[in-house]
UniProtKB/Swiss-Prot annotation:
InterPro entries: GlcNAc_MurG, Glyco_trans_28_C, GlycoTrans_28_N. UDP-N-acetyl-alpha-D-glucosamine binds at residues 10-12, 124, 195, 250, 295. One of its GO terms (cellular component) is plasma membrane. It comes from Bacillus cereus (strain ATCC 10987 / NRS 248). The lineage of its organism: Bacteria, Bacillati, Bacillota, Bacilli, Bacillales. One of its GO terms (biological process) is carbohydrate metabolic process. It is a peripheral membrane protein. Pfam families: Glyco_tran_28_C, Glyco_transf_28. The keyword Nucleotide-binding does not apply. It catalyses: di-trans,octa-cis-undecaprenyl diphospho-N-acetyl-alpha-D-muramoyl-L-alanyl-D-glutamyl-meso-2,6-diaminopimeloyl-D-alanyl-D-alanine + UDP-N-acetyl-alpha-D-glucosamine = di-trans,octa-cis-undecaprenyl diphospho-[N-acetyl-alpha-D-glucosaminyl-(1->4)]-N-acetyl-alpha-D-muramoyl-L-alanyl-D-glutamyl-meso-2,6-diaminopimeloyl-D-alanyl-D-alanine + UDP + H(+). Its main location: membrane. One of its GO terms (molecular function) is undecaprenyldiphospho-muramoylpentapeptide beta-N-acetylglucosaminyltransferase activity. This is UDP-N-acetylglucosamine--N-acetylmuramyl-(pentapeptide) pyrophosphoryl-undecaprenol N-acetylglucosamine transferase 1.
Length: 364
């Protein structure tokens, strides 16, 4: 099978694509890949580092207000379609999949117009502009949340989940706990604000640290590398309790996620895919700074099923943070109920499900 993949701009579009590619390589070692992204996007460094052939096109996103820049965007889109057709004809893929971000617009559109089987993968509850546009032309739309399905033609929608979920399975949680200094017998909560950290969560944590010192559970706090020194300076003034471990970053996150009992985090699509695949209860603090407030809608999909609590950033304080953690970790029945609810939402074989959809389209 020859697979052309496109997606970029943020890790939320790139990492699911890479997870899918890794799964296909396991199931079909003869498969060949080409990834098309932008020259300046994250994908231009991440994808080649993963050993995947990479080509770039020039494209930009539409501004939401009327702007002369949108005229340039249309011209770039048309040029991107022509460049994509050239790459497609040269690579001759059996199938093309877009995982979001404006770069996959011209790529997937060009493939559809050339009669090649096409799929878009939507990670969030609220679809992006590009995937909504492409849904008119592609063969299938793979979704991760039921709420996303209503935005697409129903005959094309298939629930696959996020391929990243597959990558957190079969991890050694005990090894993960040991690697960060957590003790095995004690309950533990991991708190983090995304790969770069989040200042409002850091501020609430610093305010709460003295009260955390009185708890029977352990706290693993990840500041984000850019915030680490500032957080540690503030912590030194208050004292660092023995049951609180602070790290700038965690490189073996799947192992650590597997080992802890509760997670406090943002509500990005990849994070939720991983948490539900592991059956992990959570307190979700959606980022209010994302397009269409999609993180709050992502969180709502999990909260409504009883798998998480939601704490809006505007309501985030030391007191509300500790309250929500205590209500879950200190109540064995609540913890167990939320574990079961999260597990029922999870799709741990998401990458394989998406590959099955691809196979069916190729064999048509």
């Amino acid at each position: 099978m020859r697979v052309l993949v496109s997606g970029g701009g943020t890790g939320g579009h790139i990492y699911p694509a890479l997870a899918l590619i890794r799964e296909i390589k396991k199931l079909n070692p003869e498969a060949r890949f080409l990834y098309i992204g932008t020259e300046n996007g994250l994908e231009s460094t991440i994808v080649p580092k993963a050993g995947i052939p990479f080509q770039s096109i020039v494209i930009s996103g539409f501004k939401r207000k009327i702007s002369l820049d949108n005229v340039k965007t249309v011209m770039r889109f048309l040029k991107g379609v022509q460049d994509s057709k050239r790459y497609i004809r040269r690579f001759n893929p059996d199938i093309v999949i877009g995982t979001g971000g404006y770069v996959c617009g011209p790529v997937v559109y060009a493939a559809a117009k050339l009669g090649i089987p096409t799929i878009v993968h939507e990670q969030n509850s609220v679809p992006g502009v590009t995937n909504k546009f492409l849904s008119r032309y592609v063969d299938k739309v793979a979704v991760c949340f039921e709420a996303a399905a209503e935005h697409f033609p129903q005959s094309k929608v298939v629930m696959t989940g996020n391929p990243r979920a597959s990558e957190v399975m079969d991890q050694n949680g005990m090894k993960g706990k040991r690697s960060v200094g957590l003790s095995l017998p004690k309950k533990s909560v991991l708190i983090f604000g995304g790969s770069r950290g989040a200042r409002p969560i850091n501020d609430a944590f610093v305010e709460a640290i003295e009260q955390f010192g009185n708890k029977s559970y352990e706290i693993l706090y990840v500041t984000g590398e850019v915030h680490y020194d500032k957080v540690m300076d503030a912590v030194k003034q208050k004292g660092n309790p023995n049951n609180v471990i602070i790290k700038p970053f965690i490189h073996n996150m799947p192992e650590v996620l597997t080992g802890v009992d509760l997670v406090v985090s943002r509500a990005g699509a990849t994070t939720l895919a991983e948490l539900t695949a592991l059956g992990k209860p959570s307190v979700l603090i959606p980022s209010p700074y994302v397009t269409n407030n999609h993180q709050e809608k992502n969180a709502r999909s999990v909260v409504d099923k009883g798998a998480a609590k939601m704490l809006l950033e505007k309501d985030l304080t030391a007191e509300t943070l500790i309250r929500d953690i205590d209500e879950i970790l200190l109540d064995a029945q609540t913890l167990q109920n939320m574990k079961l609810a999260a597990g029922q939402l999870g799709i741990p074989d998401a990458a394989n499900k998406l590959y099955e959809v691809m196979n069916k389209l190729v064999k048509k």
